[in-house]
C-alpha cells in the first residue's frame, strides 16, 4: 500500500512539472459549486448506472487528474458530449469539454481493443469514408443494408446490427456545385460562404441544394470555401485529438482566407459543425479562432437576422402539423428560439415544440454495440412523444 501511495505521489510531481499536462487546462472547474444540476439533467446518468455523472467525471475528476495522470476513469467513455450539463450549470463550467479532453488523455494511455480502435477510426474519418464510398454508392448502400453485413460488422467491429448505416449519395455536393451552381452564384452582389460539412457532401447533397435555393431566393449568392474538411467532431470525441486539431487548424485557416479575401460570413446548417467551428476548436483543441469566430453562423439565427433587415422569402402556406426537436448542441448554443421564429414565417404551419431531450444517437456513440441499449433508453421519451403526437413531420437541426 505504501509503495502504491509513493508511486502516485511521484507520478503527481512529474505530471505537475510537465508543460504538456497544462497545455489545454480549463480552470473553469474551480467555479463548480457542487449543486449537481448537471447530474440532474444528464441523460446518461439516468440510464447507465456505470456512469457517475458529469460532476464527478468533470469538475470533481479534474481536480484529481491535475495531480496525477493515473487518476483517469474508464467511465468517461459513457459521456455522449450532449452538453446538457453545460446548459444547466449556473457557474458556466465547461463540463463536457473537461470530460472530452480527459477521455482523450485516458484513451491515449490505455490499450483500447484493436477492433474497437479500427471501428472508431472508420466512424470518425468521415472524409476518407465519403471519398471511398460515394463513387460506389449504389453498391455500398446495398451491401451495408444486408442482414449478413450488419451481423458481420457487429461481430468484427462492434457496430450494432440494429442500426441502419447512413446511405451515401452517388456523387458529392461539392462536385455538383462546381458543375451546376458555381457560375450562377456570381451574379449576386451579396454573398455568403457555405460550410457544407460531411453529411451534405457525401450523404445528402439535396440539403445543400435547398440551402442554395433559400439564399438565392433572398438575392444572396452562395460560395464554397476553397477547401474544407470534416469539422473534426467525430475525431475529437473518439480519441483522435491530434488529427482533430490538425483539421481544426486547416478549416480555421481557410475560413480566415475566405473572410480576408471576400469579407463574407460563413454559414452552416449543421448544429454540431457550427458549434465545433465556433467554440470547441478553442475550448477543447486549443485553436486560436478568435478572428474568424464572429463570422461563423448557424443558419437559422442568420436567417432571423436577415428577416429583421427586411429580407423576405416567397413562402406558400403549408398546412402541416410538425414537431420541433431541439437538438442538444442547439440547446447548448441557444439557437432554438431563432429556429422557431424562422419556422413561424411559414403560413399555416402548426409547430409543436417537444420537451428538450437527447435523442441518444450522439453522432457515432449510438452506432457502437456497447452503447446501443443505453442510447435507445436515452431517446425513449423523445421517441414516445413523437410516436404519440400524430405529427406529419419532425423538424430538427441535428443531422444524426
What kind of feature is each model-predicted range?
Residues 95-400:
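Iron-sulfur cluster-binding electron-transfer modules in prokaryotic oxidoreductases
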Residues 41, 48-50, 176-179:
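Short acidic/polar alpha-helix capping motifs at helix-coil junctions
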Residues 20-24, 81, 246-247, 378:
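Short, glycine/acidic-rich beta->alpha junctions
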Residues 12, 21-22, 59, 68-69, ...:
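General secondary-structure edge motif
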Residues 26-45, 71-93, 129-130, 202, ...:
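Cysteine-centered iron-sulfur cluster-binding motifs in ferredoxin-type domains/subunits
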Residues 2-20, 44-74, 92-121:
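Non-heme iron-sulfur electron-transfer modules
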Residues 2-10, 14-15, 20-25, 163-180:
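Short N-terminal secondary-structure initiator segments
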Residues 17-29, 65-77, 216-218, 345-348:
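Short, intrinsically disordered, charge-biased short linear motifs at domain edges
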Amino acid at each position: 500500500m505504501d509503495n502504491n501511495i509513493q508511486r502516485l505521489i511521484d507520478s503527481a510531481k512529474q505530471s505537475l512539472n510537465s508543460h504538456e499536462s497544462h497545455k489545454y487546462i480549463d480552470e473553469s472547474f474551480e467555479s463548480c459549486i457542487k449543486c449537481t444540476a448537471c447530474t440532474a439533467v444528464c441523460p446518461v446518468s439516468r440510464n447507465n448506472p456505470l456512469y457517475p455523472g458529469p460532476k464527478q467525471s468533470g469538475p470533481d475528476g479534474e481536480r484529481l487528474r491535475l495531480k496525477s495522470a493515473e487518476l483517469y476513469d474508464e467511465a468517461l467513455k459513457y459521456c455522449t458530449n450532449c452538453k446538457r450539463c453545460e446548459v444547466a450549470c449556473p457557474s458556466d463550467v465547461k463540463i463536457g469539454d473537461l470530460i472530452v479532453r480527459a477521455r482523450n488523455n485516458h484513451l491515449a494511455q490505455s490499450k483500447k481493443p484493436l477492433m474497437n480502435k479500427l471501428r472508431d477510426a472508420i466512424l470518425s474519418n468521415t472524409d476518407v469514408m465519403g471519398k471511398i464510398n460515394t463513387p460506389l454508392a449504389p453498391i455500398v448502400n446495398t451491401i451495408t443494408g444486408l442482414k449478413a453485413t450488419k451481423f458481420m460488422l457487429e461481430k468484427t467491429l462492434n457496430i450494432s446490427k440494429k442500426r441502419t448505416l447512413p446511405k451515401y449519395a452517388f456523387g458529392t455536393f461539392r462536385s455538383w456545385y462546381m458543375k451546376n451552381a458555381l457560375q450562377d452564384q456570381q451574379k449576386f452582389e451579396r454573398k455568403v460562404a457555405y460550410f457544407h460539412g460531411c453529411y451534405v457532401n457525401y450523404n445528402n447533397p439535396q440539403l445543400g441544394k435547398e440551402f442554395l435555393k433559400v439564399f438565392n431566393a433572398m438575392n444572396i449568392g452562395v460560395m464554397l470555401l476553397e477547401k474544407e474538411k470534416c469539422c473534426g467532431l467525430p475525431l475529437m470525441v473518439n480519441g483522435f485529438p491530434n488529427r482533430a486539431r490538425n483539421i481544426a487548424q486547416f478549416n480555421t485557416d481557410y475560413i480566415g482566407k475566405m473572410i480576408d479575401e471576400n469579407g463574407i460570413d460563413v454559414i452552416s446548417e449543421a448544429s454540431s459543425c457550427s458549434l465545433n467551428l465556433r467554440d470547441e476548436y478553442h475550448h477543447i483543441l486549443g485553436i486560436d479562432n478568435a478572428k474568424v469566430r464572429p463570422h461563423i453562423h448557424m443558419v437559422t439565427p442568420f436567417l432571423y437576422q436577415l428577416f429583421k433587415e427586411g429580407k423576405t422569402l416567397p413562402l406558400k402556406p403549408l398546412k402541416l402539423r410538425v414537431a420541433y426537436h431541439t437538438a442538444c448542441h442547439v440547446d447548448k448554443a441557444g439557437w432554438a428560439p431563432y429556429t422557431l421564429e424562422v419556422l413561424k414565417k411559414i403560413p399555416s404551419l402548426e409547430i409543436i415544440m417537444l420537451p428538450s431531450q437527447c435523442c441518444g444517437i450522439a453522432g457515432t456513440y449510438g452506432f457502437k454495440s456497447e452503447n446501443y441499449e443505453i442510447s435507445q433508453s436515452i431517446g425513449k421519451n423523445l421517441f414516445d412523444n413523437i410516436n404519440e403526437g400524430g405529427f406529419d413531420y419532425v423538424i430538427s437541426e441535428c443531422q444524426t
